[in-house]
Amino acid sequence: MFAWLFAPSTAQACELVLTEHRTGRPLVRLALNPAQPAADVAFTHSVLGTPVLDRYVWRLDPQGWRAHLVEERFEGEGYGLPSAAGPGERLLRDGPGWRLQLDRLVDPFVILPLPAQSMRLVLADQRVVLLGQLSQKSIEIRAENCSPPK
C-alpha cells in the first residue's frame, strides 16, 4: 500500500527511521537529504481546528543525530500554542498566523498520532506520510546514516 514511501535498503543511505516507540517494531524508512536532514510534522490543532506545522532538523552531536524543533507555524491562540517567545526565540506575525523560530532539542523524538489531529510527516520532496496509518501507538522518529556537516 505504501511501497512508494520506502527508500531502497542501502546500508549508508540517510534515512528517517520510524518505529513504534515502546516495542521498537519497524514502521517505515524514508530517504532524506543527507547534507540537510529535515522534515515537517503537520497537524490540526485539537481544540482550535487550525493548522500547525512544526519544522525539525537533525543535527549530529556526540550522542548521534538528534532532532531539533526549529520553527512552529500556527494560527490562533490556544492550548499548547506559544503566546510569547522564550529566551533565544522569535515570535513573528506570518499572514493570518504566527511563526515561532527556536532551537529546541527533542530527544527522543516521539509522537502519538491522534486521529483527530491528522498528523502528517512532510519531507522536503513533498512526500507525505499519514502517521496514524502507520500505527495508533507512539512513534519514534530518528535520522540514521546522514553525512556529517563539513
Residue ranges and their predicted role:
Residues 1-7:
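Bacterial N-terminal signal peptides
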Residues 8-14, 113-118:
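A short, compositionally biased
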Residues 11-76:
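N-terminal secretory signal peptides
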Residues 64-69, 77-150:
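Mature, soluble, non-transmembrane domains
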